[in-house]
């Protein structure tokens, strides 16, 4: 059910209390404020009702479903959170309003994508945990999985990492950027996973990995410092037929520190 509460003021803290006939109660903090666009989902920084200590929303992802609706995905995170839960919200009015659709775990740093009319969620099972994939056959209401695609590599510090960047089709395969490592172990190495364009993403045997390339500070044009790294790749099929991995370049405290 939808309820309307009159006379709410911006930047004022409120507490919503729900009481059940059984005597059970649940309280959820919230506050109002101006945001551009439309709010898909909201979680108050102090609201830890459902997500341990994970309080913030991240890794946004969006697809248009075959039935015409929009499906948005995101995860919950914080420095002291469990980092393993993603949620999905649906809109049937071109993004003007959104409603909760489903929740899946373990799932973090995920990307929604369609392949031959099928809906998938490519993610990791937690911060630097195995790369996994889910499939939904009912437009995001329920999910099958997780299916493991890339485990941690024995003897190699860190683990799989990715961001909700796009997948690309090139040379008959579907490509997704993936990194390996962690901030704690000194940074990330860049790589990619792919499966045949006519294949089944839910079959791990059809996926292959390029291996991982460490960052090299001697490359031409790199920043100079002790904090330069790369991560969060985006696979792009270039007009000339090349496949390019555009990565975020972390160069804070380096020279130059931008650009």
Annotate each PLM feature.
Residues 6-8, 12, 17-108, 113-163, ...:
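Beta-rich carbohydrate-recognition and catalytic domains
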